[in-house]
């Protein structure tokens, strides 16, 4: 530490802080672009499902894939691997997002978090009530949670199309609302769509959680080591009867939000490595250069919290890989056998479409208005009720999360396809109206700013 200048640590700490602050910008950028990829994947699925290759499309996702470990065989079809295994990675990233937001984001300050929490609750309750009211007599009420979800990638993608004239607070509230929506969706899946609970599986899951805590206590920093306890939790939840993909949420919520060490040690490592590289005799000494670079990588890893480091690494893979694959595997709805003359199918479609397209924005703006008028919270700076309505329309884009819930709610293929069609129609309407209303919102804001000048 003696040869470390007095202002070097603060300067590096400042750069680290700036990197942390830019994390949300990277998140929004990735989510916005991935919305386009998701749309293309869904369009491709619909095209295949309604073409001469429909049978090939269906048979492909039922192709068995398995592994042999001695006398132990593990085999499921591709559809299962996508929906139950790959989606665990999605929920892992979602769990990390929730963990970070609770620790240092918009959900860290309860007063600041009240508005998106209340808005999210309103945006879940009213769509569920609307769906329930349409399907109460038809006996298909178990699909009530389908229109309650929000697809964060699509919602932020539409917001990105509107450009930089949208207030930053609107981005933050939409992101916070979507994350709270994810929390509610996880709770709904765990408590309402988990059947035939087997307590023996809980023992396995708890053993996996205990192994995570043991690894953290020992100080294991490599994310690869946590695949084993994550797999144990996944298996335990499946045996229990809870959807195994929720293992990702558990693992994500357990990821540390603080660096494993204080900043002084890794910053010192970085400083020493820089000094080695600056020495003249290292310019041609590959061994010293390699040593210095290894030290820099170690210092960089230790300076970043595990939740930030792992989420940054996984997020692009989830956004551009896991979610488009999920969309391609599940958005393929055949219109050939779809019959709106069936009361059950028609009411499911109607409940989902109106729940997403009308229930979401109406629930969000009503709950927000009541919370503000009662004094429970207040609108953030630069935020208007027009902005809250825009958030409501964008939150009506359920797409991937709504499809995921519909697959848990409906086992009958005809009813499942009806729910999926409702999701696609409701999400599409919400996206179009959200984009159109967003353009009007920008023009009004521009006129208001000119008149104020």
Swiss-Prot record:
It is found in: Cell inner membrane. It is a multi-pass membrane protein. Keywords: Antiport, Cell inner membrane, Cell membrane, Ion transport, Membrane, Sodium, Sodium transport, Transmembrane, Transmembrane helix, Transport. The chain crosses the membrane at residues 27-47, 78-98, 114-134, 143-163, 172-192, 201-221, 222-242, 249-269, 316-336, 346-366, 385-405, 421-441. It comes from Bartonella henselae (strain ATCC 49882 / DSM 28221 / CCUG 30454 / Houston 1) (Rochalimaea henselae). Na(+)/H(+) antiporter that extrudes sodium in exchange for external protons. Belongs to the NhaA Na(+)/H(+) (TC 2.A.33) antiporter family. This is Na(+)/H(+) antiporter NhaA. The keyword Ion transport applies. Gene3D superfamilies: Na+/H+ antiporter like domain (1.20.1530.10). One of its GO terms (cellular component) is plasma membrane. GO terms for biological process: regulation of pH. The gene is nhaA. InterPro entries: Na/H_antiporter_dom_sf (IPR023171), NhaA (IPR004670). The keyword Magnesium does not apply.
